[in-house]
Regions:
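Active-site-adjacent structural elements in enzyme catalytic cores
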Residues: 1-215
Length: 215
């Protein structure tokens, strides 16, 4: 039976974050608010949990799960060949609605799907998400919806779709933004905008003037 906590209530927030952290450590799924849409998350290093996440969404391994982190410093242990331009994007837009696709450390013991040696990583601008990520470490997080359905902007919508496949729901009210993050590939010499989202190409070009845009 799924448990739900109102993170706008101080007592519920404390209890909910504790229960969510425990659930993640047990390899279970949680739903959490972010600065874009609600996400469904699992321990990034627990293969079975990531598999459960993909199954709950009805999503295949060909659509690997992004990773959310609670601090830019966490990148040092996750990625390799991270350029100066990539760090400048981090400095300018994190925490926030920018996802960076980077090469992950080959020694990492995780299975996020068919990533081809890369990871899509982001630090969200949401206090509840950051508090949970700081407590449990990197999480595999995808939008908390069934594949093909709209990404949820509130906890009700997420729970209506995902039900008891999730152990803990953290209800932070409506999300402050309903536009997905922008995605930039920083594995290339010149970063490539793969998806224009909450951050426009014009804003990104203030940091990376030569930014290319995918067709």
């Amino acid at each position: 039976m799924a448990r739900r906590y109102d993170t706008n209530d101080a007592t519920d927030r404390t209890t909910g974050l504790r229960e969510a952290a425990s659930a993640v450590r047990r390899g279970e799924l949680v739903v959490l608010p972010t600065d874009t849409v609600y996400g469904i998350g699992a321990d990034a290093f627990t293969k079975e949990a990531v598999g459960d996440l993909l199954e709950a969404k009805g999503r295949g391994r060909n659509m690997p799960t992004p990773v959310l982190i609670g601090s830019p410093n966490t990148l040092h242990g996750l990625v390799t060949d991270f350029s100066e331009l990539a760090w400048e994007l981090v400095d300018a837009f994190w925490p926030g609605a920018l996802t960076l696709v980077a090469r992950h450390q080959p020694s990492l013991q995780w299975d996020l799907g068919d990533t081809r040696g890369t990871v899509a990583v982001r630090m969200p601008l949401h206090p509840v998400a950051i508090e949970l990520l700081t407590e449990v470490g990197p999480m595999a997080v995808s939008s908390a919806n069934l594949t093909g359905h709209p990404a949820p902007e509130d906890c009700d919508a997420a729970q209506n779709m995902l039900g008891d496949s999730v152990s803990v729901y953290l209800d932070g009210g409506p999300t402050p933004g309903n536009v997905a993050s922008s995605i930039v590939d920083v594995t290339r010499e010149v970063p490539l905008l793969l998806r224009a989202g909450a951050i426009s190409a014009e804003e990104l070009r203030k940091v990376v003037p030569d930014l290319e845009v995918a067709n």
